[in-house]
Amino acid sequence: MSRLQEQYKNEILPALQKELDMSNPMQVPKIEKITINMGLGSALGDKKVLQSALKEMSLISGQKPLICNARKSVASFKLREGNPIGCKVTLRKERMYEFLDRLINIAIPRIRDFRGFKATAFDGRGNYNMGITEQITFAEIDFEKVTRILGMDIAITTTAKSDEEAKKLLVMFKFPFKG
């Protein structure tokens, strides 16, 4: 069991249950999954971009990414249906907690001029979305081997009923918000 998973079970769950005044521990919000997505529009012209992104994402997440293909053709973008334009990974259970631990304690402190994430990036249903502009903030990526700086979107899906509950959950995980 990972460090954050034990912390959730032993410290966060009882504290959040008391704070939100819930009788059953199964009602308490928890993180369901983390989805990491890389949109690679530049992969249309250069296939090496897609291969390096797949390799880097597998290093960051610890599992093999899924290649996302274009759903429809768009002539102005020179895009055809079925062309690979991105990759994504969905993390659950053990790998999810390990990734969240590395994200909060290692990757986020390495971001230049970081002042905290916006607390307004919740979607209204208790899920949080954020973007990271450089994949080199993760310690797993070797800076010398990076051919192109790529960003990624990270979606944290929770079982919370509201944004306030989800924010309380993420704050207890020591997630850095502005203000």
Curated annotation (Swiss-Prot):
<dbReference type="GO" id="GO:1990904">
    <property type="term" value="C:ribonucleoprotein complex"/>
</dbReference>
<dbReference type="InterPro" id="IPR002132">
    <property type="entry name" value="Ribosomal_uL5"/>
</dbReference>
<dbReference type="Pfam" id="PF00281">
    <property type="entry name" value="Ribosomal_L5"/>
</dbReference>
<dbReference type="InterPro" id="IPR031309">
    <property type="entry name" value="Ribosomal_uL5_C"/>
</dbReference>
<comment type="subunit">
    <text>Part of the 50S ribosomal subunit; part of the 5S rRNA/L5/L18/L25 subcomplex. Contacts the 5S rRNA and the P site tRNA. Forms a bridge to the 30S subunit in the 70S ribosome.</text>
</comment>
<keyword id="KW-0687">Ribonucleoprotein</keyword>
<dbReference type="Pfam" id="PF00673">
    <property type="entry name" value="Ribosomal_L5_C"/>
</dbReference>
<keyword id="KW-0699">rRNA-binding</keyword>
<keyword id="KW-0689">Ribosomal protein</keyword>
<dbReference type="InterPro" id="IPR020929">
    <property type="entry name" value="Ribosomal_uL5_CS"/>
</dbReference>
<keyword id="KW-0694">RNA-binding</keyword>
<dbReference type="GO" id="GO:0005840">
    <property type="term" value="C:ribosome"/>
</dbReference>
<dbReference type="GO" id="GO:0019843">
    <property type="term" value="F:rRNA binding"/>
</dbReference>
<comment type="similarity">
    <text>Belongs to the universal ribosomal protein uL5 family.</text>
</comment>
<dbReference type="GO" id="GO:0000049">
    <property type="term" value="F:tRNA binding"/>
</dbReference>
<protein>
    <recommendedName>
        <fullName>Large ribosomal subunit protein uL5</fullName>
    </recommendedName>
</protein>
<dbReference type="InterPro" id="IPR031310">
    <property type="entry name" value="Ribosomal_uL5_N"/>
</dbReference>
<comment type="function">
    <text>This is one of the proteins that bind and probably mediate the attachment of the 5S RNA into the large ribosomal subunit, where it forms part of the central protuberance. In the 70S ribosome it contacts protein S13 of the 30S subunit (bridge B1b), connecting the 2 subunits; this bridge is implicated in subunit movement. Contacts the P site tRNA; the 5S rRNA and some of its associated proteins might help stabilize positioning of ribosome-bound tRNAs.</text>
</comment>
<dbReference type="GO" id="GO:0006412">
    <property type="term" value="P:translation"/>
</dbReference>
<dbReference type="InterPro" id="IPR020930">
    <property type="entry name" value="Ribosomal_uL5_bac-type"/>
</dbReference>
<dbReference type="GO" id="GO:0003735">
    <property type="term" value="F:structural constituent of ribosome"/>
</dbReference>
<keyword id="KW-0820">tRNA-binding</keyword>
<dbReference type="InterPro" id="IPR022803">
    <property type="entry name" value="Ribosomal_uL5_dom_sf"/>
</dbReference>
